[in-house]
Amino acid sequence: MGETGFAIHVTRSESLDRSHKAEIAVAIALGLLGADALPSGVLADNVVWQSGPAVHIGGKAVLSGIKPDNLIAVRIDEAVSHGKAAAVSGRLETNDGPRLFCHMIKFTNASALKVASIVSFEHRTRVST
């Protein structure tokens, strides 16, 4: 369906944490990957997203930094949360081959209503999803 149509196949590990905060983190990760819409209002006004060499400051900059990069499928392998922090990791299938990803998410407080900062990692792998 194209880069903004969200016709991307998403699977989740059966052992994935299904707590409320972990589910919020997964929704944020899928939004950052361009696999789904980023949850409305989740970004703090001064949110900072560091993704590789790029740094996006502010909600509009984060939204403009979302690029699906020929994304075909996403597998969420892990989602963990504790206090004001959460992490989501898994595998991507892209037109350029398989990749691993991880999003480290820091919320403004333990209620996980707003994201203060995100650090994202992604790299190629030889193992497909």
Model-derived features with residue positions:
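A beta-strand edge to alpha-helix "cap/lid" segment located at domain peripheries
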Residues: M1-S13, S64-T129
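A solvent-exposed, acidic/Ser-Thr-rich amphipathic alpha-helical stretch
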Residues: A35-H82
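Short, low-complexity N-terminal intrinsically disordered segments enriched in polar/charged residues
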Residues: M1-L33, D45, T129
